[in-house]
Amino acid sequence: MKNTTRIVWMLAVLSTFAVAANAQAAGKSAEDGASTPPAVMEIAQATRVIRGEFGLFSEDADGGEPHFVRSKTVPLVPGQSYGWVIAVRSNQQRIHWREELTLPASPVTWGAPETQGRRALSDDGRVAITEREVDLGDGLIYNAWDVAAGDPQGRYRIRVFVEGTLAKVFEFDVR
């Protein structure tokens, strides 16, 4: 298990997500522009979760354009990036988020120490709790992991809390 931080690479992927999230926040479907009720969850009055997605991050074979593909299955291939993106509207400039990543068994490694926030592990080694305080900027918060040699196969779960309130739960299979 390895936490990945590819800021420049991720920004290109996230900009695509932002367009869809902004359309949804405006009551429009990102696919066809039709009016739909916005999927909005209120968090602590000042913060609203607009949309959240889980999936795979990848690059073109030539190392060009990054891609985000929604998925509920992560290939058990070392180096495969996966994670979540959540669009948030807030009158706050900084947002606190907490991620609880639960694996079916403890991995060989959780990777390098967290450099942008805090990470704690459960006593049994199956749960990593990552917390960060981030600038909201373009309205997107995210986290990504890379599959590492020795990661367990099976059902994983990520719970994301924004400003102390459960915002999204992502369940997916690694195989």
Language-model segments: residues:
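Positively charged n-region of N-terminal signal peptides that target proteins for export
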Residues: M1-R6
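Short beta-strand edge segments in extracellular beta-sheet folds
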Residues: F172-R175
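Boundary at the C-terminal end of the N-terminal hydrophobic targeting segment
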Residues: A20-G27
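Contiguous segments within soluble domain cores/interaction surfaces
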Residues: S29-V147, F161, A167-V169
